[in-house]
Amino acid sequence: VVAAYPYGSKTIQSSYERIPGYIEKVKANGVEITSSIADLLEKVDCVLLETNDGRLHLEQAVEVFKSGKICYIDKPVGATLGDAIAIYEMAEKYNAPVFSSSALRFTPQNQKLRNGEFGKILGADCYSPHKVEPTHPDFGFYGIHGVETLYTIMGTGCESVNRMSSDRG
């Protein structure tokens, strides 16, 4: 990481409270802080779009896609299904590589399960942490972790999924 543009949500507390500390940490590691995505794009080969507010991702991603640079979008891809679909349509329009995933897909244990090291997997109980964020629907923030684990282990042939939640956190 050579440069960063530290713009995040102005309405999600877990975003705006952390950004000043993140800026200091990355600056201490020699990362240049830029004043815009346009300035950032002049300095990097690819973009890690880490804004935790999916409502901003479409606008931010389109700017990256127009540059043709590779873009990784952290969860949630978009705040709504419509935003997520629009993001992938815009990536296709600009022929820009885009990727989003939970890091849990790549954990050694999940890869061993996926690769059959413990035999054929017939079913899975997968859990995700969940923090309610009123600006995003349902499991928008953390649901990806359980879904990625499920599909990493089971593949794309999953026939049914049940979900549950608890008010105990």
Where are each of the predicted segments found?
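Histidine-centered active-site/metal-ligand motif
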Residues: 1, 57, 70, 130, ...
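N-terminal glycine-/serine-/threonine-rich beta1-alpha1-beta2 phosphate-ribose binding loop
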Residues: 1-67, 89-94, 155-156, 166
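A broad structural signal for short, well-ordered beta-strand segments within beta-sheet-rich domains
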Residues: 1-2, 118-121, 158
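Short aromatic-enriched loop/helix-cap "lid" or pocket-rim segments at secondary-structure transitions
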Residues: 13-17, 112, 136-139
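Short, contiguous clusters of charged residues that form electrostatic/catalytic patches at enzyme active sites
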Residues: 35, 42, 55, 59, ...
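Short loop/edge segments at beta-strand edges and connector loops
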Residues: 35, 73, 100-102, 162-165
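A contiguous active-site-proximal alpha/beta segment in oxidoreductase catalytic domains
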Residues: 72, 77-136, 146
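Rossmann-like dinucleotide-binding domain that binds NAD(P)(H)
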Residues: 124-169
